[in-house]
């Protein structure tokens, strides 16, 4: 989601600016575009086959038998992790082989490949960086419809719920994260987060000065793992 032409995205030039800039005036995504050295495909190859989402601890990454180019990639990812830890964040570096879908998801899938917002009871942001593979996508709030506001979807969930459309139903929607998922409006174009760009995006929390950033993980294809940093 390049900052160019995106009123909800602000582009920054450094990590310090990314960390310190406050969300305001409708801007709910900050992007530090950059290039990083190294061979990230080699890192994935050395990790070998896997399933689902595999967290990569520092020791495993350092222990990989890599060429100098692969080592540059590994050290760049480890440096990003340490940078976030130094600022009291809890990053996780993952090799995403595939996003596991809930077979009992029901009427509205609520996995990360559906456009959604992140929520928290207190002020907190989501940090994202894709090093290799398909990247996450963002969707302008103006280009999105809350899925539970779409009559046919709401009716289907209400039938699944088996009760009345009242306060208890609203609580049911919240408990199952149905109120966090969105559908693109006709003609809307999702915007890619890109490779190597470090993003800080707004979540939904009480008192937030801006709407949360709507985003999703990409569909994973067999044989195309991703390297993703998230906090």
Segments (PLM) and residue ranges:
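Catalytic core of Fe(II)/2-oxoglutarate
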Residues: 175-231
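N-terminal auxiliary "cap/dimerization" subdomain that precedes the catalytic jelly-roll/cupin core
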Residues: 1-87
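Extracellular-facing segments of soluble proteins and assemblies that are Gly/Ser/Thr-biased and enriched
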Residues: 66-118
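Short, surface-exposed beta-edge/turn micro-motifs
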Residues: 26-29, 124-127, 193-194, 225-226
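Short helix/loop capping segments that flank catalytic or ligand/cofactor-binding pockets
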Residues: 41, 138-140, 207-208
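Short, structured patches in soluble enzyme cores that scaffold and shape functional sites
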Residues: 95-97, 129-132, 140, 201, ...
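Catalytic core of non-heme Fe(II) oxygenases with the double-stranded beta-helix
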Residues: 111-192
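A general structural signal for short secondary-structure junctions and capping/turn motifs
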Residues: 20-24, 82-85, 118-122, 128, ...
């Amino acid at each position: 989601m390049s900052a160019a032409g995106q009123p909800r995205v602000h582009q920054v030039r450094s990590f310090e600016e990314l960390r310190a800039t406050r969300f305001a005036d409708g801007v709910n995504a900050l992007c530090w575009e950059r290039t990083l050295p190294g061979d990230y495909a080699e890192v994935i190859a050395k990790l070998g086959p896997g399933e689902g989402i595999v967290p990569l601890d520092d020791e495993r990454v350092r222990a990989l038998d890599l060429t100098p180019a692969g080592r540059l990639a590994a050290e760049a990812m480890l440096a990003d992790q340490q940078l976030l830890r130094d600022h009291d964040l809890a990053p996780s570096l993952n090799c995403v082989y595939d996003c596991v879908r809930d077979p009992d998801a029901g009427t509205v899938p609520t996995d990360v490949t559906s456009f959604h917002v992140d929520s928290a009871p207190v002020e907190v942001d989501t940090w994202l960086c894709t090093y290799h593979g398909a990247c996450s996508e963002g969707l302008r709030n103006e280009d999105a419809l809350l899925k539970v506001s779409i009559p046919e979807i709401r009716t289907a969930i209400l039938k699944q719920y088996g009760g009345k459309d009242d306060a208890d139903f609203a609580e049911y929607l919240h408990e199952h994260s149905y109120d966090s998922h969105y559908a693109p409006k006709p003609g809307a174009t999702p915007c890619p987060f890109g490779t190597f760009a470090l993003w800080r995006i707004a979540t939904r929390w009480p008192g937030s000065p801006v709407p949360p950033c709507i985003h999703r993980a990409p569909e994973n294809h067999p044989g195309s793992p991703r390297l993703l940093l998230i906090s």
